[in-house]
């Protein structure tokens, strides 16, 4: 106990033990470290939870997009087969409009395993855990779409709404057509994906037009799939696997080559711009 200048009594704690002071400082440091660790753990859990939420949403969107595209593609093909009310160009138009609508409404969905695999191969898309989840969602959406088509349309067993190579052309020509069409489609997709000026609506219309136009060209030979999910869903539900390997291998191989061509063109633009001393506003490509 002591007295200050005003004559008031003030309690003074005197620490006479240096070791005690050291222990107190260490305890304070330990407490601060634990508080920081707890805060970091809470932030980590919150961030992880948010990331999982976004991943679940993306996978659900992928499944929904695949369902819509495959459902309306199959319905249009079945209407042509059952009633003859739609011509093949009209079927392609329905597919193009569906793709454009889905991309404009849901945003940058793939709804095509070949697209997802290509973006992952060129490191524009994470392999784990998104790649298997996206592909699984695409196939699940396709299967559900085909089951829904059967429930709504009730086709006969001889009605076919999938894609299969035309018998007279064998397998070589359908494979080549699917390969080339998939390569061109990937060039369009990569261009839209890396063009910052193209919004969802414009990009959706461009990709939808490409799908419809290419389908119109190669449809008489291969059915115009360019999408493994579009073929695998009907093949599994209907139990018809004629040439199904074509529609798995050709789109993936074609899109890998298409992305490579797109990258080569963009690289050549950069080289020319560098040699000419100008700048070219070209974003990265798959």
From Swiss-Prot:
Motif NPA 2, which positions?
227-229
Q: Motif span (NPA 1)? A: 112-114
What are the TM regions of this chain, as residue ranges?
59-79, 86-106, 133-153, 173-193, 201-221, 241-261
Q: Which GO terms describe its molecular function?
A: channel activity
Q: Does Lipid metabolism count among this protein's keywords? A: no
Tissues where the protein occurs: Expressed in leaves and at lower levels in roots.
Keywords in UniProt for this one? Membrane, Repeat, Transmembrane, Transmembrane helix, Transport
Membrane association type: Multi-pass membrane protein
PROSITE patterns the record matches: MIP
Give the UniProt subcellular location, in the record's own words. Membrane
* Pfam families with a match to the protein in the record: MIP
Gene Ontology cellular-component terms for this entry are: membrane
This chain's function reads: Aquaporins facilitate the transport of water and small neutral solutes across cell membranes.
Family named by the database record: Belongs to the MIP/aquaporin (TC 1.A.8) family. NIP (TC 1.A.8.12) subfamily.
Comment, domains: Aquaporins contain two tandem repeats each containing three membrane-spanning domains and a pore-forming loop with the signature motif Asn-Pro-Ala (NPA).
Task: Please give the name of this protein.
Answer: Aquaporin NIP4-1
The UniProt gene name for this protein comes to: NIP4-1
């Amino acid at each position: 106990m002591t007295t200050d200048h005003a004559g008031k009594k003030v309690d003074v704690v005197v620490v006479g033990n240096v070791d005690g002071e050291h222990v107190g400082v260490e305890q304070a440091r330990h407490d601060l470290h634990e508080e920081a660790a707890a805060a970091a753990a809470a932030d980590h859990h919150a961030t992880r939870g948010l990331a999982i939420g976004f991943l679940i949403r993306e996978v659900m969107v992928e499944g929904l997009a695949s369902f819509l595209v495959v459902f309306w593609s199959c319905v249009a093909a079945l209407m042509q087969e059952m009633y003859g009310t739609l011509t093949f160009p009209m079927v392609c138009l329905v597919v193009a409009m569906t793709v454009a609508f889905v991309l404009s409404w849901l945003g940058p969905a793939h709804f095509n395993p070949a697209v997802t695999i290509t973006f992952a191969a060129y490191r524009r898309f994470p392999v784990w855990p998104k790649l298997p989840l996206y592909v699984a969602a695409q196939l699940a959406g396709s299967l559900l779409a085909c089951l829904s088509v059967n429930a709504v349309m009730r086709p006969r067993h001889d009605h076919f709404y999938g894609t299969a190579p035309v018998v007279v052309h064998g397998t070589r020509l359908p494979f080549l057509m699917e390969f080339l069409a998939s390569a061109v489609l990937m060039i369009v997709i990569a261009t839209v994906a890396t063009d910052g000026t193209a919004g969802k609506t414009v990009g959706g219309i461009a990709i939808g037009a490409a799908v419809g136009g290419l389908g119109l060209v190669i449809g008489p030979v291969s059915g115009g799939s360019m999408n493994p999910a579009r073929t695998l869903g009907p093949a599994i539900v209907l139990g018809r696997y004629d040439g199904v390997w074509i529609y798995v291998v050709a789109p993936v191989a074609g899109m890998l080559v298409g992305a490579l061509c797109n990258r080569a063109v963009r690289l050549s633009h950069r080289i020319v711009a560098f040699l000419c001393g100008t700048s070219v506003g070209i974003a990265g490509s798959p």
